[in-house]
Amino acid sequence: MANINENYLKLKAGYLFPEISKRVKTYSEKNPSAKIIRLGIGDVTLPIVPSVVDAMIAASKEMGTAGGFHGYGPEQGYSFLLKSIANNDYGSLGIKIDESEIFVSDGSKCDCGNIQEIFSTDAKIAVSDPVYPVYVDTNVMAGRTGEIGADGRYSNLIYMPATKENGFQPEIPKEKADIIYLCYPNNPTGTVTTKKALRAWVEYAKKNNSIILYDSAYEAFISEPGVPRSIYEVAGAKEVAIEFRSFSKTAGFTGLRCAYIVIPKELKGRTRGGEEVSINSLWSRRHTTKFNGVSYVTQKGAEACYSPQGKKEIQASIAYYMSNAAKIREGLKKAGYEVFGGVNAPYIWLKTSDNLSSWDFFDRLLDKAQVVGTPGSGFGPAGEGYFRLSAFGKKEDVEEAIARISFL
């Protein structure tokens, strides 16, 4: 009998979203006629926009011809998409990113989870609290986190509390962290950061030879001027940061799967002997060994997102979701809830009522209003007493959900 990776046994029982699904299923079986409105997991509800559909249809037909068939493509991504990403997502900000610094993948969740494989197993990890669970769980699996304590924290992780008191801006740790996870616009709190704050993180990373893993999957939802869209807007960030982007929420690709990671050539790591190593080269080796690339048809769809008509259609979808966010935010405020986020991000972070725990509030909403959200404690100990609602639902469902919650 083979031995197992015992680090998996250190994971908290049940990943957050499967636990939510389990509770909803139990409730539905007992209440089969109940209309449940789901504002929990951040899956989109609008269909793929016409420009993308048309591009994928054309690509599919192309694949049905002898001259247009594509088998295994370049693992890093087709040049047509890499060029579109570099020109539109970065060139528009005055940031120069080379095609060789972009790696197309099947999702930011995969990239955020896989990137840790190229770093030492004794690397010291820093995460905000609350935090997207994937950052923590993949490092638990790799053996970096130590044991979990009674307070829900792992002994070897550096936790950076993001609270109401500090504006949900995690403070820079006093100790040295090798790898720092940052997410803006933030999941789960829906808040954003400033260039001044990012400059401080870049300075810390340079001083401590740290690497910042910057998850910018929700960048397209930023509406206010002056809010940074990329960490590379900060001078020197290319020397210390990796950035993650996704088409999932931006263009509704949750079922198609397409994202990308940017690793600048300037970014270096070190061996135990002190030798500098290119992080871009390391990731390229890992990426091409374990991944065969995103399909040609999907990448043609992603390319269409950058066409003038594609941009217009996608902006309309984003406006739809952000209108939902405004409805949730204002509706909850009128109902007496303390709310955060929902302005530059599709998530609303609220304080639970009556000092209920996050899971007790989940059960109350499900039982009394048939509304499903996400317990804040599932994102970390500092999320206890908070709750996340997603703006990715249908307009009519969002309006009904807020009406139901208001009557509680």
From Swiss-Prot:
UniProt enzyme class: transferase
Protein residues bound to substrate: Y15, G42, K109, Y132, N187, N292, R388
Reaction(s) catalysed by this chain's protein: (2S,6S)-2,6-diaminopimelate + 2-oxoglutarate = (S)-2,3,4,5-tetrahydrodipicolinate + L-glutamate + H2O + H(+)
E.C. number(s) listed in UniProt: 2.6.1.83
Gene Ontology biological process terms, A to Z: lysine biosynthetic process via diaminopimelate, diaminopimelate-aminotransferase pathway
GO molecular function, one term: L,L-diaminopimelate aminotransferase activity
Pathway(s) it belongs to: Amino-acid biosynthesis; L-lysine biosynthesis via DAP pathway; LL-2,6-diaminopimelate from (S)-tetrahydrodipicolinate (aminotransferase route): step 1/1
Cofactor(s) named in the record: pyridoxal 5'-phosphate
Keyword terms, alphabetized: Aminotransferase, Pyridoxal phosphate, Transferase
Entry function: Involved in the synthesis of meso-diaminopimelate (m-DAP or DL-DAP), required for both lysine and peptidoglycan biosynthesis. Catalyzes the direct conversion of tetrahydrodipicolinate to LL-diaminopimelate.
Subunit relationships: Homodimer.
Family, per entry: Belongs to the class-I pyridoxal-phosphate-dependent aminotransferase family. LL-diaminopimelate aminotransferase subfamily.
Full protein name: LL-diaminopimelate aminotransferase
